Amino acid sequence: MTDFQETLSSVSKRFLELYRSKILSQWRGTNGSSEEEKRFNSLIQQNGFARQIFGLYKSLCFRYENDAWYSVVLDILDLDLIYSNVDKAVQDNNASDIEYQDYLVKELLRYFKRDFFSWCNKPNCSKCGTDEHLEWVGTDRANSEEAKYQCGNVEVYRCTLTGDITRFPRYNDPIKLLQTRTGRCGEWCNVFTLILKSFGLNARYIWNKEDHVWCEYYSPNLKRWVHLDCCEQSFDEPHIYSKNWNKKMSYVLAFSNDIVADVSGRYILQNNLPRNAISENELNFMCTYLTKTLRKDFNDDQIYALACRDEQERLSLEKTKPSKDTSTTTLTGTKGRESGSTAWKQQRGEDGS
């Protein structure tokens, strides 16, 4: 190594040390300060959307951090089939070791949609066995049995053929949903997020203010967060909502055990709804404050690594033009949403019209 190369290496190393020190100072310096805490408390008292974000944080950020649940998932799924299909795909595509997780996630999407979970427009009548004659009656509170499984509300239907009443509890307990194996996008995303975590994958829950949810997974191969929608068996197609579905959206937020982030820029390219539920400055503060809270017990190496990952994502989200998109979204693919009945999709504005 020449003297110049040694000097350059030394300067580079020193620069990285200073940058690391600056990052750690930013994260540690004001974390939990009385000023930030006071601002946060004031914000959630005065702003309804801020309270909603805080509620989602409490509900979602640690929901899937449960080793006992992981064991239940792995006992239920057909692991032989899953890994056999992954190995075949890896071999057929001559994939490298670092690509293995991507192929695993793609197979989990396929298996979950095609072999494991089912979509429920309406439940089947317990007497005649079909949903053909069911008509909507209304909603009801969960009974004592249903309430055991975090049931928010119950849809009630009456069969015009038999007269029987059928209840459809909207469970939020993912372990209960592993038994029922049916639902709509909320139930699907809930269980699939747990499945991703059970396989040791770095996954997070994505919430859209206009009533849709999906997942993201951090790909070691692609070195970025990848969009996943188990309802559509969709891998890395973040613009299917605004483009293929023609869905109107305002806010899209990510929740995991180490971050709360506004990822709207990844998903909203057209049909933008007004973002007036909270100021951009206050939304950024909310996300940063909650993320710092999640990371308060992390060591310096973890804080620095995550901060670098965050910065990489921030830069990518600034590239909102389609020409700069690195995803594989099928902009000329199927128009409208695949999952759900035609009437339901039209009602939600997700049929591509």
Curated annotation (Swiss-Prot):
Keywords: Cytoplasm, Hydrolase, Metal-binding, Zinc
Single GO MF descriptor: peptide-N4-(N-acetyl-beta-glucosaminyl)asparagine amidase activity
GO cellular component: cytosol; nucleus
Binding-site positions, substrate: E232
SMART domains, sorted: TGc
InterPro entries named in the record: Papain-like_cys_pep_sf, PNGase, Transglutaminase-like
BP GO annotations: glycoprotein catabolic process
Compartment list: Cytoplasm
Keyword Acetylation: no
Active site as annotated: C185 (nucleophile), H212, D229
Catalytic activity: Hydrolysis of an N(4)-(acetyl-beta-D-glucosaminyl)asparagine residue in which the glucosamine residue may be further glycosylated, to yield a (substituted) N-acetyl-beta-D-glucosaminylamine and a peptide containing an aspartate residue
Bias type Low complexity, positions: 325-334
Binding-site positions, Zn(2+): C125, C128, C159
Cofactor binding comment, as recorded: Binds 1 zinc ion per subunit.
Family matches, as Pfam families: Transglut_core
Chief localisation class: cytoplasm
SUPFAM superfamilies, alphabetized: Cysteine proteinases
Needed co-factor(s): Zn(2+)
Enzyme Commission code: 3.5.1.52
Region Disordered, annotated ranges: 316-353
Family membership: Belongs to the transglutaminase-like superfamily. PNGase family.
PANTHER family, per the entry: PEPTIDE N-GLYCANASE PNGASE -RELATED (PTHR12143), PEPTIDE-N(4)-(N-ACETYL-BETA-GLUCOSAMINYL)ASPARAGINE AMIDASE (PTHR12143:SF19)
Record function comment: Specifically deglycosylates the denatured form of N-linked glycoproteins in the cytoplasm and assists their proteasome-mediated degradation. Cleaves the beta-aspartyl-glucosamine (GlcNAc) of the glycan and the amide side chain of Asn, converting Asn to Asp. Prefers proteins containing high-mannose over those bearing complex type oligosaccharides. Can recognize misfolded proteins in the endoplasmic reticulum that are exported to the cytosol to be destroyed and deglycosylate them, while it has no activity toward native proteins.
Name the UniProt record assigns to this protein: Peptide-N(4)-(N-acetyl-beta-glucosaminyl)asparagine amidase
Origin species: Kluyveromyces lactis (strain ATCC 8585 / CBS 2359 / DSM 70799 / NBRC 1267 / NRRL Y-1140 / WM37) (Yeast)
Taxon lineage: Eukaryota, Fungi, Dikarya, Ascomycota, Saccharomycotina
Gene that this sequence comes from: PNG1
